[in-house]
Amino acid sequence: MPLSVTGFCCSSDVKIEQIFISSEHNFVGHYGQPPGTSPLVEKERIKCVTGKGLLGDRYFNHAEDYKGQITFFAAEVFERLCTHFGIREKPAGVLRRNIIVSGVDLLSLIGCEFEIQGVRFRGTQHCAPCEWMDVAFAPGAKEFLKENAGLRAKILSDGELHLGDAQLRIVKDVEALVSNA
């Protein structure tokens, strides 16, 4: 069962399964038009830049204080999605999330500062699916993912993420600190 975080500090084993970036948007700004054709690039490692995003990604330096400097998606959710639709030939990258990770309930990280492989993040919000999920994956994917389409986060320290096993360490539960104040 994936780690779920509820107001306490802890660490857990996780695994970074895949890393993706794209230099341009294929869906944002394309409503009512065909999607763009910018390739999704799978990486073995990626540079995280404080307050800016992933070096080379379309959202790098997108906007000041942007909540989606990096996006995470659970490998377990992707597996359920594939099983539900009977689709095995599409990679997790079609969902346009940056980091595919296993071993953690990502939505439990909303409001938390956490660290993976020495890089610190703040979980900001659910990365809600858009209509393009039905185009990129299969009709009905948006509805299937409406409650669990990933995590948006801010990057709080420079560093590099790489594929493989890692520790996810909760640095602080920001929402618990605010509600207890």
Language-model-derived ranges and their functions:
Residues 2-116, 120, 125, 175-181:
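Electropositive, beta-rich accessory/interaction domains or terminal extensions
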Residues 101-156:
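Glycine-rich active-site loops that engage anionic ligands at enzyme catalytic sites
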Residues 151-181:
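Well-ordered alpha/beta subsegment
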